[in-house]
Amino acid sequence: MAVFRAFQALRPIQEKAADVAALPYDVVNREEAKKIGDENPFSFLHVDRPEMDLEPGIDLYDERVYKKARENLMEMEKKGILVQDKTSCYYIYELVRKGKTQTGIVGCASIDDYRNGVVKKHELTREDKEQDRIHHVDSCNANTGPIFLACRYPENLLKLMNEWKTSHKAVYDFTEEDEITHRVWVIDEPAVIFSVKEEFAGIDSLILSPSSPSRLI
């Protein structure tokens, strides 16, 4: 039985969503991140790769890097670029490229499920990278990067998601330079939130996976 809960996301205002959207922190090197950051002051890489805003050559694990990540995140919130939802929600996230669509739902998985085996691990990870992300999350007091989990969706959950998409307008709908269109819907009705939670409670296991042909959570 999987625990998957709604939460209050800290997310970009609609008119800045395309600017805030950024590549994962570990697919760009220091120079690439710096170039993106210099060209776009709203890029979330200022939080994920904050060394771009410090002196060249600083050690990636220097305490000042983590402090800068928190400062940059707080500054984006202070300026109203990022705003937190007032109630806990689920978020439908859709990616479209060259006619192919991949749809998932964003929520909070349980660390206890990771420990008790409900979340299935796919590979060994490097301890230095783990400690870096733990320190980053602790410093920002925020989960700054998504974890992808794959599962076999119950038909009722798929139906619920499709009905929500067709009856509600996406809060974000933009296409990036890589020709990938991003769309997000916010599920904010208590009865529907309860139904989503119950559907996940009937799922035996989730698979931790950075990439998968399956639908992603």
What are these regions (language model features)?
Residues 1-206, 213-217:
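A cross-family signal for N-terminal binding/gating loops and helix N-caps
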